[in-house]
Each structure stands twice: as structure tokens, then as C-alpha cells.
Amino acid sequence: MIYEWELEKVKDWTLNEIRNRIWAAVNCGQPVPGNVSVEALRMELVKRGEEPIGYHNT
């Protein structure tokens, strides 16, 4: 479940920040800063026109 506050928090992050934080959460088990879910990060990528491919689908 994605909360509105998560999307508000990540809207100012760069694409590279979002990708790196997804990678760190999925591959290294590190929490995303601010307790944001990986699903919210994926949704933000889609909103920006990015295809959530590769490790983003994990």
C-alpha cells in the first residue's frame, strides 16, 4: 500500500537517488530513508515516465 505522504517525500528526489535507493533496499536490505516503501519509489519512477525494469520489479 502506498501512502500519499510517501509520494510527497520522494517527489523532490532525483531519478538516480530513487534508482539507487531501490537497489539498496532490494539487493542490500537497507531501509529507504524516511521509511518510504519501494512500491512508492517504483510509482514515482512510472509517474516520471520511467519503465521500472530489472531490479525495480523485484
Language model: regions and residue ranges:
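N-terminal acidic leader/helix
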Residues: 1-31, 54-55
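Short, charged, amphipathic alpha-helical segments
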Residues: 33-43
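Short, charged early-sequence alpha-helical segments and their helix-coil boundaries
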Residues: 50-58
